[in-house]
């Protein structure tokens, strides 16, 4: 699952990206850096710190960034928005890596290759402070299965300099996706020593988060995100899962031209 390791930037602006895009029709460039404390892979009981750069170019409804990839997001007058994105899944390795999720404990499981993906998004800001979003993520390469996510965002505080938001997200995968990340087939069982396991399709994670964005001036801003994730029964009992709940903390600073 791509939300850990190299996809650190996903956690940086995800709660604000859709809302910001809807409010800004100009063109701008943002660069920055962030650091994240997170498990070495989804289900690991070992944590690691990682730093990563951030880049985003946005012109009206078009964008290119390290969070989602390249895409288009259109807002309707009633707060509804639709988007389509071409992005990637970083994959997972069976050794220690700075680029991907992974740990040497997974030796014999093989690598989950980096895959090109497309994401279809629909959301609705029902009020200035409450909105929900759903998306479908499909692989274009490396048939790794489908993902389906539903998210609810609530803005607790918003003024000229600060925004505080809480969110919850339920993540689903079909049988192929869940087995890619949490299943153990015959060959993997022989090579790794893990028992065989079939995860099946359905819910694979639930996230709860609170995040804060602060504007120091017209160009500099900061961000902090604390996220708690729980893994449901179908992936909790996988032999690759050592811990079925974990925290992720992300902090970053950004400069907008």
Where are these regions (language model features)?
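Surface-exposed strand-loop-strand hairpins of Gram-negative outer-membrane beta-barrel proteins
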Residues: 39-51, 95-114, 199-201, 234-239
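Short glycine/proline- and aromatic-enriched beta-strand/turn motifs that initiate or cap beta-hairpins
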Residues: 21-72, 81, 176
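Outer-membrane beta-barrel transmembrane domain signature
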Residues: 73, 138-141, 145-221, 229-235, ...
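Outer-envelope beta-barrel architecture signal
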Residues: 23-29, 49-51, 60-62, 78-82, ...
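Cleavable N-terminal export/targeting peptides
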Residues: 1-28, 44
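Outer-membrane beta-barrel "beta-signal"
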Residues: 52-54, 152, 244-257
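Flexible, solvent-exposed coil segments and beta strand-coil junctions
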Residues: 31-36, 63, 98-102, 125-133, ...
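Transmembrane beta-barrel strands of outer-membrane/channel proteins
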Residues: 31-37, 66-68, 84-88, 120, ...
């Amino acid at each position: 699952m791509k939300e850990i390791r190299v996809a650190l930037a996903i956690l940086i602006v995800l709660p604000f990206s859709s809302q910001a895009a809807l409010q800004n029709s100009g063109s701008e460039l943002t660069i920055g850096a962030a650091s994240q404390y997170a498990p070495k892979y989804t289900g690991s009981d070992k944590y690691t710190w990682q730093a990563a750069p951030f880049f985003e170019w946005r012109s009206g409804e078009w964008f290119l960034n390290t969070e989602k990839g390249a895409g288009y997001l259109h807002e309707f007058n009633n707060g509804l928005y639709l988007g389509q994105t071409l992005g990637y899944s970083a994959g997972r390795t069976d050794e220690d890596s700075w680029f991907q999720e992974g740990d040497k404990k997974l030796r014999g499981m093989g690598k989950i290759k980096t895959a090109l993906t497309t994401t279809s998004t629909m959301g609705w800001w029902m009020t200035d402070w409450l909105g929900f979003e759903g998306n479908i993520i499909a692989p274009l390469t490396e048939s790794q299965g489908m993902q389906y996510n539903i998210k609810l965002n609530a803005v607790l505080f918003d003024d000229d300099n600060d925004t505080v938001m809480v969110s919850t997200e339920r993540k689903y995968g079909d049988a192929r996706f869940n087995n890619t990340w949490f299943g153990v087939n015959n060959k993997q069982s022989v090579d790794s020593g893990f028992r065989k396991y079939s995860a099946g399709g359905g819910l694979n994670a639930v996230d709860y988060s609170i995040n804060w964005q602060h504007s120091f001036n017209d160009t500099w801003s900061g961000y902090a995100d604390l996220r708690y994730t729980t893994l449901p029964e179908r992936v909790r009992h996988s032999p690759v899962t050592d811990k079925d709940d974990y925290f992720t903390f992300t902090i970053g600073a950004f400069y907008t031209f």
